[in-house]
Regions:
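Short beta-strand/loop motif that positions the catalytic acidic residue
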Residues: 178, 184-186
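Catalytic active-site module of serine/aspartate enzymes centered on a nucleophile-bearing elbow/loop
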Residues: 199-202, 207-242
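Conserved alpha/beta-hydrolase "nucleophile elbow" surrounding the catalytic nucleophile
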Residues: 17-22, 187
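Short alpha-helix in the alpha/beta-hydrolase fold that links the catalytic acid
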Residues: 167-171, 180, 191-203
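Active-site nucleophile elbow and catalytic-triad environment of alpha/beta-hydrolase enzymes
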Residues: 138-139, 154-174
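Alpha/beta-hydrolase-fold enzymes
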Residues: 44-142
Length: 242
């Protein structure tokens, strides 16, 4: 609704294509349902009409990491320092789900952070022994510097509660009511929104086609494989005179 208000304020009366991935893809579907008179086409990427139990479960683990950090203080941590350990761990869990086993194997393998160290010097409790561990810890602390823990909780819960059928009827009927041209884009190695879900979404929409990004980079591929995504989007827009 806020996006629609902004569009009206800017004098935008028609939208040629609403495109978005992940949470953005959920908003794409809502645009088509809430403002069909404005939207000419949609392109949801690696998303869902309703969050799967797999995604909900991963989000819950991340939220538990935050709320079990003593520094969370029931959400009232402002002025006292936010729950850095919990938010960092939540981010690390998320990073694992954004990529794939193939991408991690290719990037890190079993490489050690300090390859010059002798293996006989290792201890069971060694921290940051492997490069992948160091990478995850870095990504976790990087998010802590620029993101609010409570925002993480609410955004992840909003994704879990997302359900285009809520208040509208049964899912098949709701999806089929979207009549504008649609392009559903899946990612071959996405473990959050696997390709079978994307094909089902395309099948359920009234006038949709399906395309797939072939990549080892998991869910994040739509932020990495620009050439493939550009080719897919351009082809769809050309085919539909957009």
């Amino acid at each position: 609704r806020v996006q629609h208000v902004l569009a009206k304020h800017l004098g935008i009366r028609r939208v040629r294509a609403v495109i978005g991935g992940s949470l953005g893809g959920m908003q794409v579907l809502e645009w088509a349902l809430m403002y069909p008179e404005i939207v000419r086409s949609i392109m949801p990427i690696g998303t869902a009409a309703g969050h799967s139990p797999w995604c909900i479960g991963l989000n819950e683990i991340a939220r538990e990491a935050i709320t079990n950090d003593p520094d969370w203080r029931g959400g009232d941590y402002y002025g006292k320092g936010q729950p850095e350990r919990g938010l960092s761990l939540a981010r690390q869990v998320a990073m694992m789900s954004y990529r794939s086993d193939v991408s991690f194997l290719s990037r890190f393998g079993r490489d050690r952070r300090r390859p010059e160290e002798k293996r006989t010097e290792e201890r069971f409790d060694s921290a940051n022994l492997f490069q992948v561990e160091s990478y995850l810890h870095y990504q976790g602390m990087k998010l802590v510097q620029r993101f609010d823990a409570n925002s993480y909780l609410y955004i992840s819960r909003a994704m879990d509660l997302h359900d285009v059928a809520f208040g509208r009827g049964e899912m098949p009927g709701v999806l089929s009511s979207i009549r504008c041209p649609a392009l559903c884009i899946g990612i071959s190695s996405d473990i959050l929104y696997p390709v079978h879900e994307q094909r089902e979404l395309a099948k359920g929409l009234g006038a949709a086609t399906y395309a797939e990004i072939d990549s080892p980079h998991g869910h994040d591929a739509f932020l990495i494989e620009y050439d493939q995504l550009t080719r897919i989007v351009k082809g769809f827009m050309k085919d539909h005179g957009l």
